Amino acid sequence: MKQRSLYLSLAGILAIFLTACGGKEEKTTTDSTSMTTDTTMHTTTTTPTTPAPAAPTTATVMVVKHKVANFNKWMASYDEHDSMRVASGLHNFVIGRGIPDSNMVMVAVKVDDTAKAKAFAKDPSLKKAMQKGGVIGAPNIMIFNTTFLDNGQATNLRVMTYETVKDWDAWKTAFESGKQLRTDNGLMDRAIGYDINDNHKISVVLSFTDSAKGMSFLKSDTMKKRMAAAGVVGQPNRYYYHVAKTY
């Protein structure tokens, strides 16, 4: 299984966790090391500083995932086309680089107007801009109604999970009841959301405070049973990444 081999290959690597943002994401510069080398998951236990948690905030967020031939070239092209995004009511938020493939890029932008965002996603000029930046293959584009769960602490090593659920409200109740269990197993809640067109399609973002414990818990029978009880249908689709840039 891909996930099992990923876990076995990553779980023993030494640790470097960088402090990242809260729900509103503090502004940082691009991670220059990650721009030139592949990203690896690090096994560590991290105890971040714990400021007072903020109240949950909400936003509409477009998430785009695609592979690039060269991250530096793509990043320059992405920055070059910022005015095109702004004109469509899209605002830079987070850029992530995949683990173990650091050329598998995730872009999250905040959305002012969903109609404009949908039109932007279908605009031929976007396709041309992506081709210029070295995007390989078709991008995966989704728009979520997102709730940021600012816990006052986070690391830049994260996992984004896509799932299908029977009922959003029932799933959300079950998810909230498992907060302490996740915390005890090296995971911190970052955000949850559902597709603007179908609230049975959801996303969950967690950050790792202990990568070995967190990875083990995500693959555990306990997690599988909790997901089943919460009404998750089928297998989750997980994207492991580190935050390369925030805005």
For the regions a protein language model found, what residue spans apply to each?
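Bacterial N-terminal signal peptides that target proteins for export
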Residues: 1-10
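C-terminal motif of bacterial Sec signal peptides marking the signal peptidase cleavage site
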Residues: 17-20
